[in-house]
From Swiss-Prot:
One of its GO terms (biological process) is inositol catabolic process. This is Inositol 2-dehydrogenase. Involved in the oxidation of myo-inositol (MI) to 2-keto-myo-inositol (2KMI or 2-inosose). HAMAP family: IolG. Gene3D superfamilies: Dihydrodipicolinate Reductase, domain 2 (3.30.360.10), NAD(P)-binding Rossmann-like Domain (3.40.50.720). SUPFAM superfamilies: Glyceraldehyde-3-phosphate dehydrogenase-like, C-terminal domain (SSF55347), NAD(P)-binding Rossmann-fold domains (SSF51735). It comes from Streptomyces coelicolor (strain ATCC BAA-471 / A3(2) / M145). The lineage of its organism: Bacteria, Bacillati, Actinomycetota, Actinomycetes, Kitasatosporales. It catalyses: myo-inositol + NAD(+) = scyllo-inosose + NADH + H(+). GO terms for molecular function: inositol 2-dehydrogenase (NAD+) activity; nucleotide binding. Homotetramer.
């Protein structure tokens, strides 16, 4: 492996461009070797934005980027429907991968990725559930694992966005937005989610016509805990993520510290972040740095393909619960030995 890990970044949109900047200017031990995007001009703009013209190759084809000189690892930040194919192409080349969520558009595709990796006999992919790298979430995880508050009984979660993009559907509140809470709950509690119920309040006047927003999503775990998630993607005021763990001997709450108090003529007010890239900027930096460090040691240490599959399976059950209005069990395949818990 070279002194700087050569990374091919797939996707040069909002997330991809941010990762191109991050690998080039923030993390240590890595460099951007290639960028691929179907829109060549967008890819060139992202590369030019970091002064990479001439030293970073630009491609419209994923496989060409994977085969570009100096590529030793892959960061997938393309649209979700392209992730499965890109992951399998990286596996075929033995390239380590950091893949943004979703790992695949559905659980069937996610399971194919899990099975392909299992056939290799070693982990190659880390999935981008960045909340595991957020300082507050890590502090809460440490507290729960330490047992000081007794067993966790409930998680109360809030996930709010300023507004939803034009293509957003009611199902996407679950399989796009709440997928982060799905992984966070599994990780914090150390349990699989076993059933989902979705309650549908009267839609907000600020929601686009036909969008069921907000929703209240209730998860049950295999260990008997309950997780509730308020998801509201057109709240209008900011990006807000909170979580409270209610345990036998106390509770712990995170997420309230990410506002800024502004004092000006006429008074003082709190300002809420407007974007997830602002709220979780440090978590993204730690996530990518951790991936680079582990990859340079020949390891995969973060959330893996099984976590990507589990999130997809739970989200599918959630969408069925949204459509039917009834409690829906989560149907999951057996966990491969490659992903057995330690």
């Amino acid at each position: 492996m070279s002194e700087l890990l050569g990374v091919a970044v797939l996707g040069a949109g909002h997330m991809g461009a941010d990762h191109i900047r991050r690998v080039d200017q923030v993390v240590s031990g890595a460099r951007v070797a290639a960028v691929a995007d179907p829109d060549a001009e967008r890819a060139k703009e992202a590369v030019g934005g970091i002064g990479g013209t001439g030293r970073i190759t630009v491609h419209t084809d994923v496989e060409a980027a994977l085969d570009a000189p100096g590529v030793e690892a892959v960061l997938i930040a393309s649209p979700g429907e392209a992730h499965e194919e890109a992951l399998l192409a990286a596996f075929a080349r033995g390239l380590p991968v950091l893949c943004e969520k979703p790992m695949a558009p559905n659980s069937a595709g996610a399971l194919r990725v899990v099975e392909a990796e299992a056939r290799l006999g070693r982990r190659l992919a880390q999935i981008g559930f960045m909340r595991r790298y957020d300082a507050e979430y890590r502090q809460l995880k440490s507290l729960l694992d330490g047992g000081r508050l007794g067993r966790p009984l409930m998680l109360h979660c809030v996930h709010r966005n300023v507004s939803s993009p034009p293509h957003f559907t009611s199902a996407m509140l679950i399989n796009s937005s709440v997928s982060h809470e799905i992984d966070a709950a599994r990780w914090l509690l150390g349990q699989e989610l076993s059933a989902v119920t979705v309650l549908r309040p009267r839609p907000s006047a600020g929601a686009p016509e036909g969008l069921l927003d907000p929703q209240l999503v209730l998860f049950e775990t295999e260990g008997g805990a309950v997780v509730d998630v308020e998801v509201f993607v057109n709240c209008g005021f900011g990006y807000e993520v909170r979580c409270e763990a209610v345990c036998e001997a106390g509770s712990a709450r995170i997420g309230a510290a990410h506002t800024m108090m502004v004092t000006a003529a006429g008074g003082a007010r709190e300002e809420v972040p407007q974007d997830y890239l602002v709220r979780f900027a440090d978590a993204y930096d730690r996530e990518v740095q951790s991936w680079v460090d582990a990859t340079r040691r020949g390891l995969v240490t973060g959330p893996g393909t099984w976590d990507g599959y589990a999130a997809a399976a739970v989200a599918e059950a959630g969408v069925r619960a949204l459509d039917t209005g009834v409690r829906t069990p989560v149907d999951m395949a057996p966990r491969p030995s490659l992903h057995d818990r330690a």
